[in-house]
Swiss-Prot record:
Primary location class: cytoplasm
Annotated residues for binding of [4Fe-4S] cluster 2: 156, 160, 163
Gene that produces this protein: rimO
Main enzyme class: transferase
Free-text comment on the cofactor: Binds 2 [4Fe-4S] clusters. One cluster is coordinated with 3 cysteines and an exchangeable S-adenosyl-L-methionine.
HAMAP family membership: MTTase_RimO
Protein name: Ribosomal protein uS12 methylthiotransferase RimO
Pfam family, one: TRAM_2
Amino acid sequence: MPNPKKPKIAFAHLGCDKNRVDTEHMIGLLAAAGYGVGTDETEADYVIVNTCSFIQAAREESVRTLVELAEANKKIVITGCLAQHFQGELLAELPEAVAVVGSGDYQHIVEVIERVERGERVQQISAVPTYIADETVPRYRTTPAPVAYLRIAEGCDYRCAFCIIPHLRGNQRSRSLESIVSEAHQLAAEGVQEIIIVSQITTNYGLDRYGQPQLATLIRALGEVDVPWIRLHYAYPTGLTPEVIAAMRETPNILPYLDLPLQHSHPEVLRAMNRPWQAGVNDRLIERLRQELPEAVVRTTFIVGFPGETESQFEHLCQFVQRHEFDHVGVFTYSPEEGTAAYDLPHQIPEEIKRARRDRLMELQQPIAQRKNAAEVGKIVPVLIEQENPQTGEFIGRSPRFAPEVDGVVYVKGAATLGTIVPVEITAADIYDLYGIIPASVRFYP
């Protein structure tokens, strides 16, 4: 129970699912220390804002949130990547900021609040983040009850020319295999139906700790955990080895779903990005994946408008997308990030051209996505039920082809229980979502 003598704390979460795990650990630590924690900023003595600083748009969202809270005269604790990136500027510009906490220092959040309560203005920032929480650190999940993110590593050893993450999050540090499997068993005991494996580069898991990547070994170990769906995010092209693909194929609870950010298709652009660039590398990977795991659902992301990207190179990317027909595609316009190799490159692309290229690529993808979804009509597929509309009685869930937050959903009619996986007959589809009914003869998916 919260200690009424301690201040009330509200959280505002921004950013990626790795950042969400940090938020959940901070909530868990504060709750374990007796603090009342919630989302009601009006009642809170302090608002902790866990920020993102990955690209300009994310920084702008973080700053807007901070300014709104400052205008409401809230005492703000700024955590996460924006704090890591701009700690001095934030303290100088926001008198309401009583503390800044770096991306590798969230484990100190209770001590930070205690110091603030004593009148100190706290700057808790490690110059080089090295921390990663394990299964022993308290955590309060903020996702829908049947879903949990499981972070297997933090930081990144690669230096993609456009990416500031290594500066914000440090180099890769992997958890032990035993620690990860232990947390997976904890989540299973809590009734979790879907675990989403995350890190900066999931396919590099274990390289720093064991001397070589151990994702295939981890996949097989997670196959012993009583969770029906386990999903992998953030694969790196060269890390998707035959051993990893075989482990996915042979482990029943690993969904045949891959989040595989490719960023571009043209070798010259990929080389400038400091990505795997040898001619045809991504084509060969997709072809091998389709051959060895033909049922795989593939999500990818691309960056358009990278410095020097020509019209012909962009056309190469368009043809690549049309040729491979990915299930889900996200497109970002290049965001120049100070401190990255690409920031000072010549031939920066005007914003209006970047936006036009993004829009064209998404327009090319839409009929592909429509066809992929339409192919589901008439099938009976498992759907994890996550929400209910009390007005209509309709449920909202996801099939294995949809990851939370980034992909579509399935709108379901029929009798179901929240947090369960049920069979749904797909009756209709649009570009992003599916629609279906629960057959009367079967209530729950085995």
